[in-house]
From Swiss-Prot:
It comes from Xanthomonas oryzae pv. oryzae (strain PXO99A). Belongs to the methyltransferase superfamily. RsmH family. Its EC number is 2.1.1.199. GO terms for molecular function: rRNA (cytosine-N4-)-methyltransferase activity. GO terms for cellular component: cytoplasm. Specifically methylates the N4 position of cytidine in position 1402 (C1402) of 16S rRNA. S-adenosyl-L-methionine binds at G36, G37, H38, D56, F82, D100, Q107. It comes from the Bacteria. Residues 314-337 are annotated as: Disordered. This is Ribosomal RNA small subunit methyltransferase H. The keyword Plastid does not apply.
Amino acid sequence: MSQPPAAHVPVLYTQVLDGLQVTENGTYLDGTFGRGGHARGVLEHLGPGGRLLVMDKDPDAIAVAEQTFGGDARVSIHRGSFAGLGQVVAAATVDGILLDLGVSSPQLDVAGRGFSFGKDGPLDMRMDPDSGQSAAQWLAQATDREIADVLWAYGEERQSRRIARAIVARRAEQPLLRTAQLADLIASVMPRGDSKTHPATRSFQAIRIYINRELDDLETGLDAALAALKPGGRLAVISFHSLEDRIVKQFMARYAKAPPSNRRLPEAQPFVPTLQLVSGAIKADDTELNVNPRARSAVLRVAEKLELGIGDSGLERRSGRIPNPRSPIPASQGDAR
């Protein structure tokens, strides 16, 4: 199998294409185009009758897609979150869907996008810079409790309260407008330790996830993807942290495995699975990590949609939605959680 151009190294490239099992005349959707590494691989396997739909909420990614694939009649390009993929494709019409979650390498590498604590830039963090509040705008008006809740829920940051108090105190003196300001402030209040991880890592992740509603989009997008797939279609999802992977894992299991039964209660209907798990967690091997260290935290999961049982829509048979981790933190809890 050919490899993507060296300018962009998509994670788990071969494993994604193997998981999707691209066919010559199939219809595929890349819900997170980025710089198109995986999309190029899909196109290599499509014939003249195949079709690829690409989506991204980032206008820079859409510009790259139009420049790269705008002349290819097999490709249609759509700006927007994959949470809205149901507005782009009809139900049960797609052979394979890829969701490559989180922030892209170009977003991290360009200081002006405001995602990186290692490169000074405007404190923005929006994947779609034309929509919603920037990180700076939110931090300027959120209460210390709201900031602490976000840092804990989306970054599992044990020092969330300490960091939140420091942010509120500092903004009273001067506005927080730059990524370096925030990163330095967080580092200054964190306990010294031996970790090689930057002290602002969890906080930047948490604020980014909140600003972009990433976990909300993921839950909505997984439901939409399942509805869009044909029977026999494949869903491949790459996650980069435990919050994302937990949602993906539980979603796939919910449609593939019967929930625990309660012997005291009669079963209204027998469970009919809608998905079959194709693989467990797939991670990058040492060869890939030597080329692309950012693949270290990537986890790929693949599932295949099954034929629905008679009289069972399949999509409504759930054990309940995954709770959103944006839950209030009991006031009695301190910084160590």
